[in-house]
Amino acid sequence: MFLSTFEKQLDAKRRIVVPQEFRALAAGPFDGVFCFPSIEADCIEGGGKALFDRYNGVIEELEFGDPLRSALETSVLGGMAKLSFDTAGRITLPESLCDLFGLTDWVTIVGLGDRFQIWEREAFNAHRAAQRELARQGLAELRAQQRAARLAHSGQGSAG
């Protein structure tokens, strides 16, 4: 699993060192990663062949000509870049992706299980704060639902 958060600096050629743990997880038919504009946030999404296969599987399940299939093909497959690791474990981010997300200096690489994201550092800090608040609220709601379900279940057991 891609885990943890790392801050890395882009060099003048838009190269970043990919954390060793991430390089090992991305191992597959080629020595590198697949990257594309995320469809859920303003960042680059990346991963190994398993992530590519997962998105491709979702796309293949949709009928040819389905508007969602076309949107996913354009957004994911059309925006995807196959980025190979150099001998120092770096990838060179495409200029188009750097321009799209304002990646010019420091970036944040965030592990999300089966994938990772590359963010402009300040944009990620704002995103992380919003996600923490959403997680807090969601967890509180989930706990309330679980308590209500336990109470309802225990109430049904004693009514009979």
UniProtKB/Swiss-Prot annotation:
Its main location: cytoplasm. InterPro entries: MraZ, MraZ_C, MraZ_dom, MraZ_N, MraZ_sf, SpoVT-AbrB_dom, SpoVT-AbrB_sf. The keyword Repeat applies. GO terms for molecular function: DNA-binding transcription factor activity; transcription cis-regulatory region binding. CDD domains: MraZ_C, MraZ_N. Forms oligomers. HAMAP family: MraZ. This is Transcriptional regulator MraZ. It comes from Phenylobacterium zucineum (strain HLK1). The gene is mraZ.
